[in-house]
Amino acid sequence: MDAEQRSVFQGIVYYYRENMVNCRYQVTLKDAVDGALLQQALDAARAKASYYFQKPVWEKKLLHLEPSDAPCPVRQGSAKPEFPDENGFTVALSYEGKVVYFDWFHFLADGRGIAPFMTMVLQFYCNLRYGTAFEGQTLETDPAYDIEDILAKYPESQVANDMQRPVVQTFEETPTCCRIRLEKAGLVDAALRCGVKPFSTLTALLCKAVRAYLDKDEVLYSYSTDARDALGAPNALYNCVASFQRKLPLTADAPLAEVAVGVDADLKENLSAERKLFRIAEQMGWVYRVYQQKASLSIKKRIFQMGEYISGFPADFWVSYLGDPFRPSSPELTRYIEDFQTWVPADGASIGLECTSLHGIITLCVKNKVPRPGFAEALRAAFEAEGIRVLEAVELGEDLT
């Protein structure tokens, strides 16, 4: 696989999925957005971030990226764009009222990969609107990792891997959305009582809520980790996610500490560089086999989806915790930002939860394909049972995006 092929392989899986996985960062500023200034900020950031403005082009059943000087206009309104857009891009910017929307096709980048670009656009906007003096560093991505090298290092990953797991039946109804906000301090206190990381406590509480909501004695959950450290690519702007899965037998009266300790032990085991690389080999090995097929994209999609389904990839829920969404972290920038939300399709699970932290509040943005009401209240009940203050638990209705 040459360098050009490696540069698209990191995200090629999102062309094999049944549905487009388009992501959205939703940022509420302290004042109404000035569209003209936002366009200037985008143009200034683009000059320092050419990676995001390459066009994916299909030729002879292969995909490659081409640089483009086509315009990228800021749009008014909250409607999500189709990707690629009319200029061939897979990233878009729009606004409405006080809210700025950053949309992108997951093929281009994961959340941490898009965050430096989003941060720089907001910094340049604040320079123009509020007279701040953010500089903005040129964003250059590390070279793409070589999946063939990783597979050669871990040949056993393709022998006893996901392809032998039992299939979990997921719900695939029209998604609905809900949003939960809770005090971060309360979650941290609960984690201290359990003697584990806050993310482990959060995941344990999600397991308890999902168990009650789905009325299941066993919950299968997935969580994502950033694998840039393991890949030796700290400045990668492309997808670098290693996803892990765990099956958890659970009773209604299971103490939080007991559940959280098990979650935490699993998490710690999987945070090592060796485990992340092995997992990359497992999850991308099937992608590589499909990629190597001399077939059309439509045939590759069918092959991939069948293999992924029987591999046991689907889960009851997945959770992704971005934490501070800005790269680099900037207390000065957040003075001008009131709220931050992350919305991603619940691909590969019945329920998908994206979690971010801002101003001492953790916001959970949930897309739910289970055709029954009550998940927001199930989450509220799980958090409040442990003394964590819930500031909001609201059902937002059908996902029309």
Regions found by a protein language model. Give the residues of each.
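Acyl activation and transfer enzymes in specialized metabolism, enriched
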Residues: D31-A49, D103-T119, I180-D215, L364, ...
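Acyl-thioester-dependent acyl-group transfer interface
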Residues: M1-K61, S68-A92, R211-T401
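Histidine-centered acyl-transfer/condensation active-site motif
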Residues: P84-L128, L139-P143, I147-I150, T356-F375, ...
